[in-house]
Amino acid sequence: MKSIVFVALLGLALLAVVCSASEDAHKELLKEVVRAMVVDKTDAVQAEERECRWYLGGCSQDGDCCKHLQCHSNYEWCVWDGTFSK
């Protein structure tokens, strides 16, 4: 009788350790996923900043603005250059 109780308690202790380790691994995986999402979002923002400036975006020369936009000389923002071609 004592050996059955001992084996049952040992089994429960082992199960608790395995579940705890699994929960820790799950938390670490969740942290990695969230970190990857934040890094991807940061990279996307940086990529947008490296690209051209959109309409009414700040600029210092025409090359800063997107296609069909030019840098307004007085206000230093991108405005339409009057073209329609693709």
From Swiss-Prot:
Protein name: Omega-theraphotoxin-Hhn1a 2
Disulphides: 52-66, 59-71, 65-78
Tissue: Expressed by the venom gland.
Organism, as annotated: Cyriopagopus hainanus
Function, in words: Ion channel inhibitor.
GO cellular component: extracellular region
Pro-peptide region(s): 22-50
Entry text on domains: The presence of a 'disulfide through disulfide knot' structurally defines this protein as a knottin.
Annotated PROSITE patterns: HWTX_1 (PS60021)
Family: Belongs to the neurotoxin 10 (Hwtx-1) family. 17 (Hntx-9) subfamily.
Upper lineage: Eukaryota, Metazoa, Ecdysozoa, Arthropoda, Chelicerata
Domain of life: Eukaryota
